[in-house]
Design a protein with these regions (language model features):
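Class I SAM-dependent methyltransferase Rossmann-like catalytic core
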Residues: 2-55
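Short alpha-helix
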Residues: 45, 169-195
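Class I SAM-dependent methyltransferase SAM/SAH-binding core
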Residues: 48-111
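A short SAM/SAH-binding and catalytic strip from SAM-dependent methyltransferases
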Residues: 118-133
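A short glycine-rich, Lys/Arg-flanked "PGG" loop and its adjoining helix->strand segment in the class I
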Residues: 133-148
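Conserved class I S-adenosyl-L-methionine
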Residues: 148-180
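Core SAM-dependent methyltransferase catalytic element
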Residues: 186-187, 195-221
Length: 221
């Protein structure tokens, strides 16, 4: 069975994906930020989630990648590809095996063949997606059947680059929002969301996760 999905960002309220700063993202991210964006406890929570959910020796895409991927130590991987906006940040990322500079807000079509990856992760960056449903459709395309998609976020952001609907939402609302992106994109199943380090936060930065898997149904894009 094959199903055709169309972009559905227009199913959200008008202006949902507008930002205070609509300048070119490549300009905003041109200067490398060689820092982490969550604290050590939150990093440990993200790393443990990856270790728990991504099988050893997987082929993984770190979408919207930067200076660090928070890949768990001593967890073998076959390939960890970064896709982001700053080459210097990704060049200095010790977890990545390779990387590509690409702006998904300009072009959500990911530059990879169908069914390339066992897993795709977006780490503390979904708030910046201006075409999330389109992007998630292409995440589904590059995932192998039953491949896992893990989106994590905290309460930190560059507010001028975060989309309006994200800034206006609560933490619970943001989990529901990311879940809705997956649902609208189609061909994702077993969508689950949760506050993964609630017992440690505070003092640790909070980490929320939305996780799904590519279904066996084939989708045309």
């Amino acid at each position: 069975m094959r199903t055709r999905r169309l972009p559905t960002e227009n199913n959200y309220p008008t202006g949902s994906f507008e930002r205070e700063d609509e300048s070119d993202d490549s300009w905003f991210y041109a200067s490398p930020r060689l820092v982490v964006h969550i604290d050590e406890g939150a990093i440990e929570a993200v790393s443990q989630l990856f270790k728990d959910l991504i099988p050893p020796n997987s082929t993984v895409l770190d979408l919207m990648s930067s200076w660090r991927s928070h890949w768990p130590q001593h967890h073998p991987k076959r390939r960890l590809t970064g896709l982001g906006l700053n080459a210097q940040e990704m060049e200095d990322n010790p977890d990545l095996t390779d990387y590509v500079v690409h702006n998904v807000n300009d072009d959500p079509a990911l530059p990879f063949d169908d069914e390339t990856f066992n897993a795709v992760v977006i780490t503390v960056s979904p708030q910046y997606l201006t075409r999330p449903v389109d992007t998630f459709q292409h995440v589904n395309r590059v995932l192998r059947p039953s491949g896992i998609f893990i989106v994590t976020f905290s309460n930190r952001m560059f507010p001028t680059k975060a989309v309006r609907i994200w800034r206006a939402s609560s933490d619970q609302g943001r989990m529901e929002l990311v879940s809705s992106y997956m649902d609208a994109a189609g061909n994702f199943e077993d969508i689950k969301a949760g506050f993964i380090n609630e017992e440690q936060s505070p003092p640790d930065d909070p980490i929320f996760a939305v996780v799904s898997r590519k279904s066996q149904e084939t989708t045309d894009y």
